[in-house]
Amino acid sequence: MEKKMIPAERQKTLLNLISKQSVISINNLVNILGVSHMTVRRDIQKLEEDGKVISVSGGVQLLERLSSEPTHDDKSLLATTEKTAISKKAVELIQEHSTIYLDAGTTTLEIAKQIANRNDLLVITNDFVIAHYLMVNSQCNIMHTGGLINKSNRSSVGEFAAQFLHQISVDIAFISTSSWNLKGLTTPDEQKIPVKKAIIQFSQKNILVTDSSKYGKVATFLLYPLSSLDTIICDKGLPENAQARIAEMNVELFLV
């Protein structure tokens, strides 16, 4: 027989239990709380949707908190195989004579490398590495947002860059992130907020390009919910429960 406890009280207790361990199994939670597996899974789903926990195989853990953005150099060494596969899928979605936006990041840099031989595209970016690569190696037309420079990220941030984006219309924006979960995209850098929010307003289609290692992380500032996106391109390491919830949001999901 289940213990009588309202959902909010039970979820608070569940959070306290999870916070004391790096990972706790569903079976342990069932025994401690004295409720059914279904009840525990329902509570975990609610907490995951609220951006507080992440489901793992047979259990649950707290989200990993991202206190600062990794540098461009650090990110360039991570998940290289996944980024290449993601970028190849992204390029398949770019129609001829499109205006596209490449957000600052190493996954979007891989997209830039994939489109270098195309002369029918206008590429807008706030990333200096992407702009330089395309300037030297590509046939694309290129525009840079300008604005305050984030040296470690090698990109422009802040209101000036955002104001540039207010004056354009983009067919597809490829958006990057270092932390996301079922609640949405987050950032530890307040100066990135204006650019991130501007591009999603002035693009006809918004596509998140991210490898699964960034899922289950959270930072201080919420940028926007996943439901604001049209498409997510990720690798096959994305947890199955996350795949199911994304489908329920009517967000297109490609796993490569």
Curated annotation (Swiss-Prot):
Residues 7-62 form the HTH deoR-type domain. Keywords: DNA-binding, Transcription, Transcription regulation. Disulfide bonds: none annotated. It comes from the Bacteria. Residues 24-43 bind DNA. GO terms for biological process: regulation of DNA-templated transcription. One of its GO terms (molecular function) is ligand-modulated transcription factor activity. The keyword Ion transport does not apply. The keyword Transcription applies. InterPro entries: Carb_Metab_HTH_regulators, DeoR-like_C, DeoR_HTH, NagB/RpiA_transferase-like, Tscrpt_reg_HTH_DeoR_CS, WH-like_DNA-bd_sf, WH_DNA-bd_sf. This is Uncharacterized HTH-type transcriptional regulator HI_1009.
